[in-house]
A protein has these predicted regions:
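Cys/His-rich metal-chelating microdomains
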Residues: 45
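Flexible coil segments in periplasmic/lumen-exposed cytochrome c-class electron-transfer proteins
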Residues: 1-37, 41, 76-187, 192-198
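Extended intrinsically disordered, low-complexity coil regions enriched in Ser, Thr, Gly, Ala
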Residues: 57-86
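Carbohydrate-interacting regions of secretory-pathway proteins
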Residues: 201
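Short cysteine/histidine-rich zinc-coordinating motifs and their immediately flanking basic loops
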Residues: 50-56
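Primarily extracytoplasmic ectodomains and periplasmic/lumenal surface modules that are beta-strand-rich
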Residues: 48-49, 63
């Protein structure tokens, strides 16, 4: 029961990050209007997020605040009508005070984002089930062709699904040849099909 109680963020490694502001560490008390969930429950105390939401560590404060504003006023939406947590995010953003928004923005901006997704090229992937917006391998179910998908799964399903472990990484299964195609796109625009990513992003 405690593992599913999102009143308080699971902070297994408090030494990995600065002290969390109240809005990052705890949701508002029941009965307080409006109800606001804690930022760290979904995006984790280190801001790395998970496949069902987003990594927000290291985002500039101004950009962070603009995204909150866009979520809150309805300017930012999702292309997937079945993605329920977008509505949760929009409601949270709309209900934040300016003080809470700035505290969260400054906190996550102070944390450096580090890689925790490993790309693995493959022809087959584990059969999976959806667990609240991300995919978890089904034990004993075997594999299936990857096709043209990119499939992200946790390295340790129990650590991610049950304990929300912010140190437990993810595997991104991709079709064979994807990494070279990605490099070509970044460095040369995909054989001239478009602008190289490095032209803007370095």
């Amino acid at each position: 029961k405690q593992l599913r109680d999102n009143t308080n963020v699971f902070d297994w490694f408090p030494g990995d990050h600065p002290a969390m502001p109240e809005i990052v560490a705890h949701r508002r008390s029941p009965g307080v209007d409006p109800w606001i969930g804690s930022c760290g429950w979904c995006h984790l105390p280190n801001g790395k997020g998970r496949p069902e939401n987003a990594a927000i560590a290291g985002l500039p404060v101004d950009y962070f605040l603009r995204q909150l504003s866009d979520f809150g006023n309805g300017a930012r939406k999702t292309a997937d009508p079945g993605k329920k947590n977008t509505a949760v995010m929009s409601g949270n953003a709309a209900g934040l005070t300016d003080e809470e928004a700035h505290a969260a923005a400054a906190y996550f901006a102070s944390i450096k984002m580090t890689p925790w997704i490993k790309a693995v090229e493959t022809d087959t992937v584990p059969k999976t089930r959806n667990s609240g917006g991300f995919f978890v391998p089904i034990e004993g179910a075997g594999t299936e062709p990857i096709g043209q998908r990119i499939l992200e799964v946790p390295e340790d399903p129990e650590a991610a699904e049950v304990y929300r472990n912010p140190r437990s990484g993810w595997i991104a299964y991709v079709p064979v040849g994807s990494i070279k195609k990605g490099e070509d796109l970044v460095r040369g625009g995909g054989s001239g099909k478009t602008m190289a990513c490095t032209a803007c992003h370095g």
